[in-house]
């Protein structure tokens, strides 16, 4: 599975988290892992193996653990917006990309931003990609 596919699954897990409380989410996440929805771009043979599931679970847990800090960083640069007022797609992508920018040294900032923008084009509204790009650009400038 490519990094892009893992990133998309991470986004989907974070997006899913927005709809469930802390008691319900673990069960829903397990269901997702048992039968992940693959995109039309994904080769059907590229099924999620155990190592990928483990990596994905660790990554989602690490991001979830840092949500208050990630939201604080996003809120500091999102003029006129707070994460609690943003769309679920946008906030999930912003959290993922902010995590990658701040904590994942293997992913260049430009790659994190570009991938978030591409996912915003795919899953968000017409304005999502520019919204995500603008906030992440400000975040990188201010750090």
Regions found by a protein language model. Give the residues of each.
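N-terminal interaction/assembly modules
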Residues: 1-129, 133-143
């Amino acid at each position: 599975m490519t990094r892009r596919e893992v990133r998309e699954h991470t986004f989907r897990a974070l997006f899913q988290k927005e709809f469930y409380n802390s008691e319900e989410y673990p069960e829903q996440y397990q269901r997702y892992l048992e039968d992940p929805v693959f995109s039309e771009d994904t080769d059907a043979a590229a099924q999620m193996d155990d190592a990928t599931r483990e990596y994905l679970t660790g990554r989602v847990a690490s991001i979830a653990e840092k949500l208050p800090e990630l939201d604080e960083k996003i809120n500091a640069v999102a003029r006129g917006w707070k994460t609690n007022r943003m769309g679920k797609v946008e906030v999930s992508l912003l959290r993922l990309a902010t995590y990658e920018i701040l904590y994942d040294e293997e992913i260049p900032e430009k790659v994190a931003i570009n991938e978030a923008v591409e996912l915003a084009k795919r899953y968000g509204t017409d304005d999502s990609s520019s919204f995500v790009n603008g906030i992440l650009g400000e975040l990188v400038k201010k750090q």
